[in-house]
Amino acid sequence: MILKEGEVVFEVPDKLTVTKKDEVFYNPRMKTCRDISIAVIQAFLNLYHKRDKFYIADALAGSGIRGLRYAKELEFNGELKVFLNDINPKAYEKIINNAKLNEIENIDVFNEDANTFLSKHFRFFNVVDIDPFGSPAPYVEQAIRALVTRNGLLCLTATDTAALCGRSKKSCLRKYLAYPLFGRDCHEFALRVLVGYVMRMATKYELALKPVFCHATDHYVRVYLVTDRGAKRADKVFEMLGYVKDVNGIKIIKKFEEGYEKGFAGPLYIGNLYDKALVEEALKIAEKREFSERVLKILNAIKGESAINQVGCYDTHQIGKMLKISVPPMQDIINKLKEMGFNAVVTHYNPKGIKTDATLKNVIEAIYQCTKIR
């Protein structure tokens, strides 16, 4: 069966399934994720990459659609090359055939274990993309080692949201060495746990990673982190880590150096998840390339979030239950908070979640005022 995604046509098995047993894995539900990846990596190229070569690794390539789209759709004046790898021999053959189908030549294809492939390319790639079925944790260290130590971009997908979102705490502790936070904004804390884990793993190599873009969509979370080198920079990473406890919608935050206390989630990242300039550039690129309304909606929401450094969000449904009132429309609450002098947006991951620099007391006041108006 021949399909098209972005500017790439490709062949997949007639029966599309999404399990680990698939001979050659392709998930059509991840098109939104791949579209956003194109926008984010292109934005990174435009803003931060100053050299004449740009090498990308797609270490778990499956049918190759992600890596082939990078090779064909990313715009760069210098040498752009994508290295696609999959341990499955049939996937390896499929990638080669799909590349021929699209007349794509700026690629190399490998048939190896992902960690073996990455270990053979020490400090080589400008971008390493890990898009597994499940957790990226088994590949994180080799992915970090395969990146250039300054302005390298690490892109990770995790589909094990039961662990990261707190439904399986032991699994999260085992994979990410952290306790998750289960609640209305658990998807944001899934991002923060994953980012915090990656940052900690990098410090042993005297590398400081920081997030520049993240999103939680459908059944997965996706994070993008940029590398920088130096022991002092790596030491400062721990200042951006901590522990969080949710008490009736209020987030209590402890610094990493204070240590773990029972009932808290973490260690996790407690800083801003976004590089505002990169988010704005990615949105411009997505608009120019006429990506789907859904992609634009996600990027627009994240643009608003990037200007607010709040850990978690206020869930209006939870507040309504607590106050025993009917919650007014979200946009009314947002407008009221802005009238009160605060910045406020609806989160991209929770349609009932508000990210704002206001306190919970201010949010409750805004809800009451909107209720009276109605």
From Swiss-Prot:
Which residues are the signal sequence here? none
Q: Which GO terms describe its molecular function?
A: tRNA (guanine(26)-N2)-dimethyltransferase activity; tRNA binding
Q: What class of enzyme is it?
A: transferase
CDD domains linked: AdoMet_MTases
Where does the Trm1 methyltransferase domain lie? 1-367
Gene Ontology biological process terms in this record: tRNA N2-guanine methylation
The record's InterPro entries line, in alphabetical order, gives: SAM-dependent_MTases_sf, Trm1, TRM1_arc_bac, tRNA_met_Trm1_C
Which reactions fall under this protein's catalytic activity? guanosine(26) in tRNA + 2 S-adenosyl-L-methionine = N(2)-dimethylguanosine(26) in tRNA + 2 S-adenosyl-L-homocysteine + 2 H(+)
Pfam families from the UniProt entry: TRM
What is this enzyme's EC? Answer: 2.1.1.216
Q: Which residues bind S-adenosyl-L-methionine?
A: 34, 66, 86, 113-114
Task: Give the highest taxon in the source lineage.
Answer: Archaea
Alphabetic keyword roster: Methyltransferase, RNA-binding, S-adenosyl-L-methionine, Transferase, tRNA processing, tRNA-binding
Entry's NCBIfam families? Answer: TRM1 (TIGR00308)
Functional note = Dimethylates a single guanine residue at position 26 of a number of tRNAs using S-adenosyl-L-methionine as donor of the methyl groups.
What does the sequence similarity comment in the record state about its family? Belongs to the class I-like SAM-binding methyltransferase superfamily. Trm1 family.
Q: Which PANTHER family match?
A: N 2 ,N 2 -DIMETHYLGUANOSINE TRNA METHYLTRANSFERASE (PTHR10631), TRNA (GUANINE(26)-N(2))-DIMETHYLTRANSFERASE (PTHR10631:SF3)
Question: What protein name applies here?
Answer: tRNA (guanine(26)-N(2))-dimethyltransferase
Q: Which organism is it from?
A: Methanocaldococcus jannaschii (strain ATCC 43067 / DSM 2661 / JAL-1 / JCM 10045 / NBRC 100440) (Methanococcus jannaschii)
